[in-house]
Amino acid sequence: MASISAASATATASTKLAYPYSPSSSSSSSNTAAVFPSNSSKLILSSSFTPTPSTLFLHSPTTTPSTTHPRRFTVRAARGKFERKKPHVNIGTIGHVDHGKTTLTAALTMALASMGNSAPKKYDEIDAAPEERARGITINTATVEYETENRHYAHVDCPGHADYVKNMITGAAQMDGAILVVSGADGPMPQTKEHILLAKQVGVPNMVVFLNKQDQVDDEELLELVELEVRELLSSYEFPGDEIPIISGSALLALEALMANPSIKRGENQWVDKIYQLMDNVDEYIPIPQRQTELPFLMAIEDVFSITGRGTVATGRVERGTVKVGEIVDIVGLKDTRNTTVTGVEMFQKILDEAMAGDNVGLLLRGIQKIDIQRGMVLAKPGTITPHTKFEALVYVLKKEEGGRHSPFFAGYRPQFYMRTTDVTGKVTVIMSDKGEESKMVMPGDRVNMVVELIMPVACEQGMRFAIREGGKTVGAGVIQKILE
């Protein structure tokens, strides 16, 4: 239990920067000075839910950096209503560490800003957490927004480092499509494969590939070989490798050109044109998802903030249905189910009358204390989902070559089960083969049915997917076949 709460505390801390909803300084205990040392980084946040900006001291969840640099981030209050003029798509960058995911994200916002379709974000604004500064790698999941001529995008810059695959699972679960970034100079690497596998597991339906660092590859044939290797790799994970668009370019040279001249138009710089070409392909290849707006409302909670005098804000992606101000919702999972009224809805610092499936929003909840609600719970239309601790699932256990276990496991095995934004320890009580015969042992590479008992109740339902993790790596993926308790 202690390890779970510690893990969720770390996860909560790690997502703070991605959301523009204000926590209140008074929500921490009165001995703030004792809890947060003076060298903690400081975050100034404000939103339309609160009249004055509040200050939050962010303390790094890891102790690796020997020093932390105090920095201020100011998030402006809501600037009016969010207008639904274009279809909305959730997208994200995935791929190996240092292949250029965050650089590409910055180049995308700068290029589309030059067309008047987004607010430009510099590299350090996206890559903005103490751990990232200390190790030069992206750890947190940052969300930016931009528009093409036809669509509005919410873009998640997914972490690439293997230690932070947990965030990747949460981030990838939010994607309608992905941009896989592969260095043309290095080709596919271990985390490239792990991210493609994770994308398959959590149901990312489509992806477009950006072969980065083209300027570092002298031989055109080498680039073609890397492209061929990427297509074969995608096909091996059951993506349509032969059809997926692959665009080569240099995110860094495009970003440098845009920093030097932010008003560059199409046709004026070959590297910036590659960025436009990438987004043309994303527009064409990644379909607008069919939103599940007709189904009952459900949103998995990713983060929680408290605002004195107003209530508590829960942030996350609306999985299905719609929710309006004034509607009653159930809070389900981990603790006893209770209900509350939604008193405010916000997306990207703008007020919404109604949130619908696919939106990343913050919901202000009446009469709920911050201690009553946590990451991993879900908000849902009353009576439409219930918490469970026991289910039967169809599970694929990864082979050693896929990064899975090297040895078999038996009934009584206790890994972590990742469902939506929840990670809960569970016990495998019964193992059955595909033919329905009880089995004693599961080998890496097996597809089996198993009965799982969770140590805490989680809002789950038939057809829901999950990942199985052990010792910092994914060892299996499954789908719930039947709820038992």
Swiss-Prot record:
Query: Which keywords label this protein?
Result: Chloroplast, Elongation factor, GTP-binding, Nucleotide-binding, Plastid, Protein biosynthesis, Transit peptide
Q: Name one GO molecular function term.
A: GTP binding
Localized where?
A: Plastid, Chloroplast
Region entry G1, spans = 95-102
GO CC terms in record: chloroplast; mitochondrion
Residues annotated as transit peptide in the record: 1-76
Query: Where is the stretch described as G4?
Result: 212-215
What is an example of a Pfam family matching this protein? Answer: GTP_EFTU_D2
| Residue ranges of the region described as G3 | 157-160
Instruction: Identify the stretch(es) annotated as G2.
Output: 136-140
Residues bound to GTP are 95-102, 157-161, 212-215
Segments of this protein annotated with the region G5: 250-252
InterPro entries linked to this entry:
EF-Tu_GTP-bd, EF-Tu_GTPase, EFTu-like_2, EFTU_2, G_TR_CS, P-loop_NTPase, Small_GTP-bd, T_Tr_GTP-bd_dom
GO BP annotation list = mitochondrial translational elongation
Give residue ranges for domain tr-type G: 86-290
Q: What is the role of this chain?
A: This protein promotes the GTP-dependent binding of aminoacyl-tRNA to the A-site of ribosomes during protein biosynthesis.
What the entry lists under HAMAP family is as follows:
EF_Tu_B
> What protein family does this chain belong to?
Belongs to the TRAFAC class translation factor GTPase superfamily. Classic translation factor GTPase family. EF-Tu/EF-1A subfamily.
Protein name listed in UniProt: Elongation factor TuB, chloroplastic
Name of the gene this protein is made from: TUFB
